[in-house]
Amino acid sequence: MHDPFAMRPFFGYNAGQYLAHWLTIGEREGARLPRIFHVNWFLKDAAGRYVWPGFGHNARVLAWICSRVGGEDNARSTPVGLVPREGALDLDGLPSVSYSDLFSVSRPFWEKEVRELRGYYEENFGEDLPKEVMEELEALEERVKKM
């Protein structure tokens, strides 16, 4: 399910218009845009085990996010966005957690992700999906194809 913040059931009006509203926020005079980070707390390895231990360890991710917002250059660029540089996220005391498992960018995974997002958009937004959102998905798809 592609439902960031689990908000889809609570949209009080057309979901496409809801997204379009959020896209206009940066157009306001003096707008201070939020920094947006994506975290997949539920990523699983090939054996079906969660890659990240969760719970209190999530504070480690939040610490990295805060340092990023504070201007620290602790990320590397990938076709899907910025991820922590190796060593930038505190993994001390987590012997079963692998940096490469957390931050590898797999072409098959992202090809599937793009297909699923496209289906989600079609099913939930149809023609009401703002063109900017589809343009971002198409740009992501192109970057994934070049991996």
Q: Predicted regions span which residues?
A:
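Conserved NTP phosphate-binding and transfer environment spanning the P-loop NTPase/kinase superfamily
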Residues: 1-147
